[in-house]
Amino acid sequence: MKLVQIAGYLGSGKTTLVIALSKGLSRSGLKVAILVNEIGEIPVDGKVIEDYGFTVKDIGGGCICCQIAGNLTRTLRFLGDEQNPDLVIIEPTGMAVPGSIRETVEALNIDIGPTIVLFDTTRSEKLLNYETLKRLISTQIRDADFIALSKIDKVSEDVIEHASEAVSVINPAAGIIRLSTRRGDGVMTLATAVQEVTIKK
Amino acid sequence: MKDDLRSRDPLHEGIFAYSVSCLLSRDREIEGNELRRFARELMVSVSGTCFHYGAIDIGHIKAYIETGTGFLYADTLGDAGDVTIEGREGDAVRSFRLVLNSVIYGITEEAVKEATEEALERTISGFGLSRQPVAPKVIPLYRPEGGRHDG
C-alpha cells in the first residue's frame, strides 16, 4: 500500500484534483482508496467524492496533522487490513502541515509517495501577504515534493510566473506543475508521477 | 466540540469553522433550478456576511443539498461571481437536506457562527422555507493555551 498526499490551503482545488486523479488511476487498474479529512464536523468533501462513485473514508472533527493523528493511524490500519488498496490518496484539511502527516505515516511503515501541495494562483498575493496565512502556506510549500500551481486557467501568464517564483523561493527543490484541473492541464503529469511510485512498489 | 480536539498549532491561528446540517421544507414544490438558485444565493450571502463581520479571507464556504433524487454541491471563496454549483437537480421536492460548512480567516469563532447563521436564515426566509432545528456546531480550531496534543 502506497500513500500520496494532496495537500494545500483551503479552497486551492484539492477535492477536484483528488476526483480527477482517482478517475485516471482507477482506469489504469490501480485499486485506489480515498481518505478525506475535513475541518467541519459534518463532512462535505467526502460526500461529493462519493457522488463520483468512489469509496471514501472520512475523518472529521479536527485536523489529522495535529489534533487527531491517532484517527489517521487507525484509519490507515483499517484500510490496509480490510481493503488492501494499491494506493491511498489522502486529502488533508486545508490547514494541515503535510510533514506532520508524513511523520505519522512513516511511523506505521507505510510507503509514502510524493506529497503534492496545491497553491492557488488566483489568491497568491493574498495568501502570502497575511502573516499567519503566510506561515502556514510557506510550511505547506516547504513540505511538498510537487507544487501544483492551481487554477491557471483563471489568471494571466504574469501571475503564474510570479506565483512560480514565489513558491520556488520557499522550496527550490520541489517540482512545479501548472495545474488546471478543469481544463485538464497538469493532471496527467501528476497521475504519471503517482503511478510510477505506486508501480515501483 | 471536545476540548481535546481543539488545535493548538499556532499555524492554525485565526482560522475557524462552523458546520450546520438542517432539513428545509415548504408546502410549494421546489424545482431543481430553484435549488441551484438557493445554493448560489446562500454562498454569496454567507461570504458577504462574513466579510461584513470583518473576515480577511474566506477559506471556503461549501454546501451540499440532498433530495431523494438530486444532489447539488456548491462552493465559493468569496468572490460573488465565483460560485461553483455542480451535481444533479433531481425531481421537484418539498423538503431537502442542507449541509453547510464555513471556514473563515480573520474573525472569531463566534463571529463565524453568527455570520453563517445570519446569512442562512436570511436565505431560507427569502425562499419561503422553514428549517427544522438541528443543533449547530462550532468547530474551534485554535487554542493558544497548552493541553494534550496527540500529533
Write out the residue ranges for each language-model feature.
Chain A
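Canonical P-loop GTPase G-domain recognition
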Residues: 138, 142-201
